[in-house]
Amino acid sequence: MDVREFYGGDLQGVLDKMDYLQDLGVEVIYFNPLFVSPSNHKYDIQDYDYIDPHIGKIVSDEGDLLPDGQRENRFASRYIDRVTNKANLEASNELFAQVVAEAHRRDMRVILDGVFNHCGSFNKWMDRERIYENAEGYDKGAYVGWWGHDTLPKLNYEGSQELMDYVLHVAKKWVSPPYNVDGWRLDVAADLGHSQEFNHHFWQEFRKAVK
């Protein structure tokens, strides 16, 4: 197995196996994080607006792998094309909508994994890896990593109403047409924010947004 390749299936595979899932009596499909992310586990979100083309659909695959010995991800031009090319991103979202629609046609429900306490160091907001054109990037040492992990920047909701509004928009977006997801599983929900008071406030607003 090539360590630089992703492991596992994709959304087309789920779509192809719908008959099998229905025959098993499956009533709910719960997906681990599906959004753009450089890892296999995808709890380090890079872009909340799009399904990762590696598990969605790649229609443009230009560029090169990161050269051996090169440690700067801005030179991984094939990865950058895969996850920033609008054709790939939009095709992946469309495929996900098809998966949800087919699940609903079979009376199955679909749950997404929401990772909103932290994002990933590849995230387009901070672009630590310098893979987005014209992004401002970040000041070194200017963020706190969740549980000390520098690849998992903790989101500072108290310091940004814009951030809170955007994440609530994301939450609503995926439960609305054309995606129509049935609900969210919320990762490390109790850790979000910097106080219990704000944590409760945020999730109350989240609930209002998705109802």
Q: Which residues does each PLM region occupy?
A:
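Active-site and adjacent substrate-binding regions of carbohydrate-active enzymes
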Residues: 1-211
